[in-house]
């Protein structure tokens, strides 16, 4: 199951890290619509509960190994039982606030304190926010840095401030124009940009583009403020997938 270029990056990037130097792990929602063939490979690790303001929600953690990489899956049928990963924005803003909190609270449970958490797009935009505002005083999280990657500036995860505040329990002062507020709404992408330690995007030219009024989707001023922390990195090619020696869609296989 994949819905775009983000899936290609998350699926391919981790396996190319040097396993002797880096302990790379991936954590994803356990969507009901994931491939049924994968389910028998998942092993239950644990369960716990997270608070979303006044809500208390179940979190189940499953794990599996693929291409030498450890994957974790966050289970919650209230949020992830749909027929597709993304629904309407009203449901998604609560779903991904839950996911961001569940990821952070899973770390001490699975006894893994990463040096860096790599977040992708607005769906994980609140993770750097939660890390610095809610968990910043907890010694377990001290020293954990975040990298926030923007794949498409157009999709920002915007919704009513009152309802986002109700879901997240974030303090009122965060919903200002210098942090999460954006034209009267709360903006998850903006939160990630403001709170992440470093920001990357899919190419050097796109990094330049999102700093302009034409490409910044209203956030160009903020991107200019954070330009020193912004890097454009071209997506690589997964040679296990795009291999001219094995590609059945070309007339002749060949070695390059």
Where on the chain are the PLM-derived regions?
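N-terminal subdomain of nucleotide-sugar transferases
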Residues: 1-63, 203
